Amino acid sequence: MNAIIAEPGHVSFDDLARVYAGAAIALGPAYWPRVEAAAAIVAKAAQGAEPVYGINTGFGKLASKRIPPDQTALLQRNLILSHCCGVGPATPEPIVRLMIALKIISLGRGASGVRRQIVDQLQAMLAQGVCPFVPQQGSVGASGDLAPLAHMTAVMIGEGQAFVEGRLVPGREALAHVGLDPVTLGPKEGLALINGTQFSTAYALAGLFRARDLLNAALVTGALSVDAAMASTAPFRPEIQALRGHPGQIAAGRVLTELVDGSAIRLSHLEGDERVQDPYCLRCQPQVAGAALDLLTQAARTLVNEANAVTDNPLVLVETGEIISGGNFHAEPVAFAADQIALALSELGAISERRIATLVDPALNFGLPPFLTPQPGLNSGFMIAEVTAAALFAENKQRALPCSIDSTPTSANQEDHVSMAAHAARRLHDMADNLAHIIGIELLVAAQGIELRVPHGTSAALSAVIGALRSHVPALESDRYMADDLAKAAALVAGGALARAANVALGRDSFPRLG
């Protein structure tokens, strides 16, 4: 995959998704002069008599301690080593790579005061597959993601640990394996590298990418459930959505209509159906999935903006030569965005679980056998699969509680309000795993329901989706070991197979975009 030439301030959602998928990133040539100009301002300040935070002073509560010029390099090294306090399992490699890319973008804005060789080192590590071991826990999202970014920076200076070709080795060995030497940090460079929101933002973006794919899958399984339940598609008509006007609702209604279009099941009950209205889990899909889409779209705007931002402290104003302390490291926007994503994930699971419950209940599923097994009683069918979906939804509901309201003072009360953005973003991945299983269960249940509607068939798009499922999981004719079926269905959901199959049948990309 070719490297993306980054224009800091203008990196797109799709660019970030490509980095998450494995692309490297390189700073565009037009941005180097500003990087070097900011570094020159810092170098001059380091030799001056005036105290400048993080350049010739201590850090945090120790900012009043002056550091002589001959100890500024040691100051930065000590900062990195002392801040490597992360705990817990390793952050997944795609997220670490995205974090490094975000740091390159931030430094490339030319307001951090680092030398070119610092950015070059990050670019080389990213391009050559040096992935620092970054523990998942230890950041409160202000003053930036200090501990996680310190673990990244430790590898740059030959310390810490990194993965190379799947092996965890000492940082110096990892660099040598790809022909790199450790760098020596100059004034402010350690602080610029660890002060920022890149860990939280990378985790939140990764959660957003997964949420986008899960939303698309939920639209597909929601359409399958509509046909399996012989529900009405009239509530999806564009006139209904337009009268409310929310963009996500309009898009969701359109997708649901396109997916079911041409279904013989639908045509079979256009007339003579005594039911006046369907349950909300079927009828209100545009309103719920659409609201989730709008939340994800808003979160995408916030996170793309943050990905292009300068979030360390202090910042260098090249035009005036000033070095100004601020608070861009506070990750409240990221925490809010992560909380929004969590709400969307939770509600997509909530309504999917209700559709599953509707389809397995003979009082609600309009003529299908109990728990969708041809021989109920002897067989239990999808009885406990629905219970599993309920259990997973309950977990996600608890995880969806906002993390951004849970501040606690740190650093001798100097950092007295924090965002908890890292925790807010990390929990998205457990939620996404749960949601993939919930939607996977709906896929199994709805496909079974449609196949029990013979001789009537579903639409071309939904038939293609069922075909993709059946290449991995056969229909449930009698009880069997179910865990493998659930795992395979969840993998199809998480991997985007449902939307791809539908798009091939439709001959176009019918699903909404976030960026």
Swiss-Prot record:
Protein family according to the UniProt entry: Belongs to the PAL/histidase family.
Range of residues in the leader sequence: none
2,3-didehydroalanine (Ser) carried by residues: 143
Location in or out of the cell: Cytoplasm
E.C. numbers: 4.3.1.3
Pfam families registered for this protein in UniProt: Lyase_aromatic
Keyword Signal: no
Record keywords: Cytoplasm, Histidine metabolism, Lyase
Transmembrane annotation, as ranges: none
One of the record's GO cellular component terms: cytoplasm
Origin superkingdom: Bacteria
PROSITE patterns per the UniProt record, alphabetical: PAL_HISTIDASE (PS00488)
Annotated protein name in UniProt: Histidine ammonia-lyase
PANTHER family reported in the protein's UniProt record: HISTIDINE AMMONIA-LYASE (PTHR10362)
GO biological process: one example: L-histidine catabolic process to glutamate and formamide
GO molecular function: histidine ammonia-lyase activity
Catalytic activity of the protein: L-histidine = trans-urocanate + NH4(+)
Gene3D superfamilies: Fumarase/aspartase (Central domain), Fumarase/aspartase (N-terminal domain)
